[in-house]
Amino acid sequence: MFLTSVVSLVVGAISCVSAAPAAASELMQMTPRNSCYGGGLYSSYWADYGNTRYSCGAGGHYDLSWGNGGNVVAGRGWKPASPRAVTYSGSWQCNGNCYLSVYGWTINPLVEYYIVENYGNYNPSAGAQRRGQVTADGSIYDIYISTQHNQPSILGTNTFHQYWSIRRNKRVGGTVSTGVHFNAWRSLGMPLGTYDYMIVATEGFRSSGSASITVS
């Protein structure tokens, strides 16, 4: 998800940039501090340090707070995923390096993807290659691709692409038409495979903040 390269959920980044939050893929090696199911939605919470707190409840809601330390990523969504309109609402506050995104994976090809709705002082496009842009849900999203070499993934250590759509007009709340992004990526030579999980993720790296998000 973030990166030095963050987690099984989540919001993520580019491992080649040491200042970036750890990629969600890297965090997947860690033991989950907590996960829960409710409201028919998948839930995941990962952290590599103790100064975090996560809870989730009915109706696709989750709360996360974190203090300065390591990497944390948490969120709610679907497993398996599908192209769908993802609606979310709530509050999100970030001090430092954080992301709020729709985050997920596909298999064959193995792809880690992010539709970034908001971020803190680190733009995840740093170090990635720009491929184009797409207009969706009231904003232009800039599209990037990056590569992780021999990094942890949902299929173990692998080399895989990361796809990014980064919203220009940051927001907290709204509808994300994921199918528009998936189609745009494919049209730019960025194929997707079989959908694994997809969540609305909050991710933080050596930062502090809080999130109270409801996903539907």
Curated annotation (Swiss-Prot):
Conditions for induction: Expressed throughout the entire infection process during in infection of rye tissue.
One Pfam family per UniProt: Glyco_hydro_11
Catalytic activity: Endohydrolysis of (1->4)-beta-D-xylosidic linkages in xylans
Name listed for the protein in its UniProt record: Endo-1,4-beta-xylanase 1
Disulfide bonds: none
Annotated GO biological process: xylan catabolic process
InterPro entries: ConA-like_dom_sf, GH11/12, GH11_AS_1, GH11_dom, Glyco_hydro_11
Function of the protein: Endo-1,4-beta-xylanase involved in the hydrolysis of xylan, a major structural heterogeneous polysaccharide found in plant biomass representing the second most abundant polysaccharide in the biosphere, after cellulose.
Record keyword Amino-acid biosynthesis present: no
Molecular function GO terms recorded: endo-1,4-beta-xylanase activity
Segments forming domain GH11: 29-216
Superkingdom as given in the UniProt entry: Eukaryota
Keyword Transmembrane helix appears in the UniProt entry: no
EC annotation from Swiss-Prot or TrEMBL: 3.2.1.8
